[in-house]
Structure formats: C-alpha cells, structure tokens
Amino acid sequence: MTPQIDRYAVFGNPIGHSKSPFIHTLFARQTNQSLTYTAECAPVGGFIEAAKAFFADGGKGCNVTLPFKEDAYQFASRLTERAQLAGAVNTLKKLDDGEIIGDNTDGAGLVQDLLQHQVVLEGARILIIGAGGAARGVIKPLLDQKPTSLTITNRTFSKAEELAELFSVYGPVTAKEMNIVAEEFDIIINSTSASLSGELPAISSSVFAANSTSYDMMYGKGDTTFNQWAKQHGAAHAYDGLGMLVGQAAESFMLWRGLRPGAKQILRELRKNLEGQ
C-alpha cells in the first residue's frame, strides 16, 4: 500500500496570487520531504468550515493569509506566545493528539530577512509605519533584538497608542502622530499596503538617518513606491517584503517538518520567478 503523502495548504481570499505553493514545493525538494502544498480559496466568512474540512480530511498543516488570520486565531485550540501577542495566526499545525496549534511566523520572517541583509537591530532606532495586524505581528520579535527604541506611527493615532501600550512591557515602545514624526531613525519599516496602490504614507522624509535602512513589507518586480521614495530621501539600503515572505514560510516549514530549509537560495528562485512574470 502506498503511504499517504502529507498535505499542506494556504488559505486566503483571493489566493491566486500566492507564492506559498512555489516556496513550499522548493523547500520540500531542498529537504527531501514528500508532501503536497496547494492554494485554497475559502469563502469570506467560511474559513473555519474550510479549515475543519481540511484537517478532517487528513491535512497536516496550513498557512493562513488575508483575510483569515483572525479567524485562524479563533480556530486554533492552542496558541504559541507569539501568536497570542500578534492577535493573529498565519500557521496551523495538527498535533498527534488531534489539537490544532496556531502560530504566527511573520515577525520571525522579518527579523531573519533583516539579519540576512546584515541590518543591525541591536541598539537601532526603529520606526514602524502602520498599526494594523502586519505591524502587531512583528513588534515583539523586533524588541527581542534589543533596539534602543521602537516608535509606532499611524494615520489613526489611537491605534498606534494601543499597540505601544500593549507591547511596552517588552521594551522601549512609543507611539507618535504621523504629522509630528520628524527625528531620524536607523530602520524604517512600512507595514501598510500603500505601495500596492502607488501611494505613500503621510510621513516626513526627514526620518531617514545616514546609512538608514528602509523596509517595505509589500513587494513587486522592482522597487516599491515606498522604497523608491526612501532612496530619494537618504535611505542607504532598501528592501522589500519578499525575503520576509520566504522567512515566515521557512519558519512554518520548521514547525511542520522539524527541518529548517535554506531561505537564501529559494529567495533567489522566487525573485527570478517574479521578475520573469
């Protein structure tokens, strides 16, 4: 009898654009793991039913992307500390006892990518633009790297304040209104999706210190709108979120399979795939 191949998937809506099947197929090949990984479009409001069916049918684990990360948080029967702090889940795994554990690997993916680029996080002055789920998922992993300060700014200031209050117990976090942020930072992270529509956050260009790094969580063929602007205004280095995508995927793969794939080679392949489209 042929042993059943372990099944994994990514759930989202829309999901056609997802790079996750490409990434995990390469991870499996690289680590000699026998598995399948598919993209599944769940109806809005129907994620929990879709996830239940997936696991009941033998699914081993899945990634979760927009708009279902909060639903996945509710669905999990157990949560890791980083998932609890993020208030959202991007990785689910079925344990041997049948429980479903929820994790959030986004922050680990971001930190891995920054370190891969030799960005020094310890002692850095970090600015995060945006206070939504994407920002919330990365604050604790960034604070674990011991920056001098982490400032959150957002169009709706009260949201930035809420996040600063939530995470202040873990390190030096403050919230600042967008129109008064004018000091220099070493690392400026855009967690908003503004670049997707070619827009810029309403922030002063004076935030870029000498030798500063700009990081946009969005990605595309060339420089994102935000990174183009950052380079024009003094950022010495600019990176997009493709490496974070591969990093969070590697962390998910590690949770599922107990093996950490090499992200660097896969990122090269993915970049080539993206540029060729």
Curated annotation (Swiss-Prot):
Its EC number is 1.1.1.25. Disulfide bonds: none annotated. It catalyses: shikimate + NADP(+) = 3-dehydroshikimate + NADPH + H(+). Pathway: Metabolic intermediate biosynthesis; chorismate biosynthesis; chorismate from D-erythrose 4-phosphate and phosphoenolpyruvate: step 4/7. One of its GO terms (biological process) is aromatic amino acid family biosynthetic process. Shikimate binds at residues 18-20, 65, 90, 106, 219. GO terms for cellular component: cytosol. Keywords: Amino-acid biosynthesis, Aromatic amino acid biosynthesis, NADP, Oxidoreductase. The active site is at 69 (proton acceptor). GO terms for molecular function: NADP binding; shikimate 3-dehydrogenase (NADP+) activity. It comes from the Bacteria. NADP(+) binds at residues 81, 130-134, 154-159, 217, 241. Belongs to the shikimate dehydrogenase family. Involved in the biosynthesis of the chorismate, which leads to the biosynthesis of aromatic amino acids. Catalyzes the reversible NADPH linked reduction of 3-dehydroshikimate (DHSA) to yield shikimate (SA). Homodimer. NCBIfam families: aroE, PRK00258.1-2. This is Shikimate dehydrogenase (NADP(+)).
